[in-house]
Structures are given as structure tokens and as C-alpha cells.
Curated annotation (Swiss-Prot):
GO cellular component term, pick one: Ndc80 complex
Protein name: Probable kinetochore protein nuf2
InterPro entries tied to this protein: Kinetochore_Nuf2_N, Nuf2_DHR10-like, Nuf2_N_sf
Subunit structure: Component of the NDC80 complex, which consists of at least ndc80, nuf2 and spc24.
Region ranges (Disordered): 1-26, 331-354
Biased amino acid composition, Polar residues: 1-14
Keywords: Cell cycle, Cell division, Centromere, Chromosome, Coiled coil, Kinetochore, Mitosis, Nucleus
Naturally occurring in which organism (per UniProt): Aspergillus fumigatus (strain ATCC MYA-4609 / CBS 101355 / FGSC A1100 / Af293) (Neosartorya fumigata)
Gene this chain is encoded by: nuf2
Amino acid sequence: MAYNHRMSQQFHGTQQHHNRGRKKEDENDALMRLPDKEIAGCINDIGIPFTAADLIKPNPQQIQMVFEWFAELLMNTTKETVEPAMRAAAEDICGDYPDIVPLETRNLMGFFISLRRLMMECGVNDFTFTDLTKPTHDRLVKIFSYLINFVRFRESQTQVIDEHFNKTEKTKARIDTLFMENQEMEQRLEEMRRSLKANEAQVKEKVRRNDELKARLLELRRNQERIAETLERVKADKARRQAQLEEKTERSVRTRQEVEKLRPYAMQSPVSLQSALTELSENLLREKAQIDAMEKRARALQTSSDTFTVVGNDVQACIKLLEDISVELQKEEEEESRASRNKEAISERGNNVREVEQTEKLLQRQLARWNERIEALRKNAQEKAEVAQARMDELRDVQKKLREERAEKQRDMERRRIRIEQTEKKMADLKENIENEIQSAHEEYLKLESHIKLYITEMEKCL
């Protein structure tokens, strides 16, 4: 008895909670509810003939046309727009038996899915397929009231909607601009890398040429020093020999003068004169040979002096060339320092690029994980579709039996037809759940894409 009492209390508590929720919904419906004439007038204003009598005794085709107009106005969706997707779904599910679900019913089911999403946004959370096929006055008044109030609210917020739409367009344009700037930065980075490689080759060539010029400069300096030493030695030898020549010339003149003085004395003794003459001839020959040798030596020294003058000019040209080479070396050193600074800047940017590549690899791994998750969702959807296919096969068998027994079991066939409709509704719910899962996966992918673009933006700021 105590157990039954607790169950009774729980049932009454649940019933009271349900009654309070129902009462709150009724109050909301009463606030949103519009008169029949106002609803009919609003529908007439959109271009569809409609009266209060049509609302009291609704025609499903007319009601579907009104719903289709509202869906086209608010969502740009009609039966024709959902036909390709429903046809593809029918081909996947029904396979070789596309006539199981008629075309009109199929399109109406797809339109119902889109319309129910609109109704949930409008506040009608209990919208069913029966509201399209078998509408009632109370349901239509509630649904149309919510729809019309939603349209009025939307028209009053047109400026805000346009503002958010413009912000979205600006964001898309900004994303495209940033993407193009990223491409340009990557191209500039590649060009800088190519120019770095080209500059490295030029720097190596200039360093090699610089080393060759340094070696040649050192060799020319050594040659200059040797030539200068030889020139100094030759000049000293020339001065010494000129002094000797002048001394011997002076001695020869003095000797001649002495000969002239001694000539009268020599005339007195022929023998002594002959001997003196012989001696003087020998001395003269020796002096003459020495003078010829000295003249030859002087000519040789003059030739050497001219040669040294030419060599001195060459040395001056070499010195000028060395000065030019030193200027070129200074320029090369400046270019080398500039190239080193550029190389450091490029290495720093290379480090930034490596960091970006690491970030990109991390994002690629995250993207791969999300792709795997999406693939798992697709496999799950495929499994559910296979289950639905098996269920459809069962329904075909049931339909075949119903056709055979239609004449004698009309009432049983009606009950089975209702069961088939319920099964189709479950299939539609299942398809909607699959679409919701795919939509959520797509939203996750968009979030991941926005994160990637954010990282790219941060990378561009760093660059």
C-alpha cells in the first residue's frame, strides 16, 4: 500500500508539473494568438486569396501553398528546391523501387523538414506532418499567428539584419584580402630566398676574386720591393763608377801634362825616350781600354737607368692599381657586411617561417582528426541508412502482403498503412538527425578553418 501511495504521489507530481508547463504554453499562445480576420487579411496581403472560412475549414493544398510562400519568403525554400536532395535520398534508400514513395509525398516530406526548422525558429516547437496533410482550425491559428508575428518582428529588425549581413560580407572580404596578402608574402619570401641563393653565389665569386687580387697584390708588393732594392744598388754602383771615371780622366789629364813637361828632357836621350814612350803607350792603351770599358759600363748603366725608370713607372701604375684594388676591396667588404645583414634578416624570417610551418603541421593534424571524426559520422550514417534499407525491405514485404490481402482485410491494411507512415516519419527523423550530425561536423570544420585563418593572421602580423 505504501508503494502504491508513493507511485500515486509521483504520478500526481508529474501530472501537476505537466499541467503547469501546459498552462504556461497556453498563456504564451494566448499572447501570440491573432484574430481569424487579421490572419486572413495578412495572407491576402501577400497575394494568396484567403478568408476566415478557409481558416475554419482548411484545405490541405491551400494551406501547403501558404506555408510554401512563407518558407520561400523567409528561407528561400520551396518544394522544387528540395526535390533534388529528396530524389537523391530516394535513389539511395529505395534503389530499384523508386515508386514506393510518390514524388509529391517525397517532396512534401523534404519541405516539411525545412518548414519544421522554420517553425522552431518562430517558436512553434510542436509542428507535425499532420499540420500539412490534415490541418485544423486551432493549429492553423496558432501556427499562422506565430509566423505572422515572426515576419513582423523580422521586418522591424531589417536594419539590424542588414548591418550584420554587411559585417559578414566585410569579414569575408577581409578574409579574402588577408589570404591574398598571405600569398603575396609567400611569393616575396620565395623571391627573397632565390635572391639570397643568387647573392650567395655572387658573394662566393667576389670572395674568390678578392683572394686572387690579394695574392696578386702581395706578389706585386714583393716585386716592387725587389725592384726598388735593385734600383738603389744600381744607382749606388753608377755613382761609384762615375766617380772612378772622373778620377781616372783627371789622372789622364795630369799625366798628359806631365808628359808635355818631360818631353824636352826625353829628347835628349832617345833610348830613354823610347822606353818612356813605350811605357806611356802601354799606359795609354791601358787607360784607353779602361776608358772604353768605363764608357761601356756607363752606357750599360744608362740603359739600366732607363729600364729602372720604366720599371718605376710600372711600379707607380701598380701602386695606383693597388689603390684601386683597395677601394674595390673596401666596397666588397661593405657589400659583404650588407649581405651578412641581409642573411641574418633572412635567417630570422626563415625561423619565423619554420614556426609557421610547425603551426601549420599542428593544424593539419587537427584537421586530419576532424576528418577522421567526420568519416566516422559518415560511416555511422551509412550504417543507419543500411538499417533503414533493411527496414524498407521489410516494409516492401509487408506492402506485398497487404496488396494480396487488400480485398478481404481492408481494415487491417489501413492499420498497416498507418504503421508505414509512422515508419516513414521515423526515417525522416533519422535523416534529420543525420543531417544535424553532418551540420554539426561541418560547423566544427568551419570553426577549425577560422582558427587556421586566425593563426595565418597572427603569422602575417609577426612577419
